[in-house]
Amino acid sequence: VWLIGLMQGVTQTPLCIDSPNAKLLARILEEGHVARPGMVNSVNEEGDKCETIFPLIAGTPWHVVGLTCDRDGIPADPEKKIDIAKRIIDKADKYGVALNQLHIDPCVMAIATMPTSMKDFERCIRGIHEYAPTVKVTGAISNISFDMPARKYVNMNCMAYAIAAGLDSAIMDPCNMDMIGTIYACEALTMKDTGGKNILRAYRQGRFGVKK
């Protein structure tokens, strides 16, 4: 709690409150420690986390991350991940949480141990959007490159494939110019940035590319 106060003293950026302890997250929400609602990270289908957090953020500006895991852990089968996501989405809707404030994280696995990870990630993105088009899908992109050489190339290509599949956001370093360039390029290529206005503006602002 002391860290929340410290951070709010130096930035106007909404905070992401991160803890595996749902009761701690609930306490922070109930006691009003956060001045500018940001994101709660996270809920899942293990225990009663959804039931604890969703009633507290319903009707508020808070966003929330939902992990596709349950009491048995993270399933390897993408269809099981999608089923968990559906249960989280249904509970969010039941408690009145706006679905466009729910961000499902399909828990990206490393290709070093699960070669189908990229294909599975794409399947999850599409499957979640098919079930609930307004729900956001996010993911920790760098998870996919654990134990791989020159990890940034794996990460950049993972980002490209994921955006093409419909990824809405990513857990990543926002100062990584290579990844920022990949995002802008993919949005132009997939017609999310029609005419390339955003990529041109970002390049001129020095957000990616060679610094002059």
Regions found by a protein language model. Name each.
Residues 16, 39-41, 65-66, 171:
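Conserved beta-strand positions in the central sheet of alpha/beta enzyme cores
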Residues 211-212:
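Long amphipathic alpha-helical segments
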